[in-house]
């Protein structure tokens, strides 16, 4: 099972997109549809962008992994604020 470790740094609400979390990917491969559980709330990645372009996957070794924005549901805002600068492990959904 693929796992990716993402460290969120900033959280923004973007009209027409939802919640955009910028940060860096420390390891693994991150794809839309992957899921994390933070404080018993499941969070699903809706999309990934880097350098203003949608991307289907990013690896921890890619240059885009350092300036990454992941799009998440707005319902995740409260748990993400508490998780800024902490590692979040995303896994492939089953």
Which stretches of residues belong to each language-model region?
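Structural beta-strand segments of beta-rich domains
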Residues: 19-21
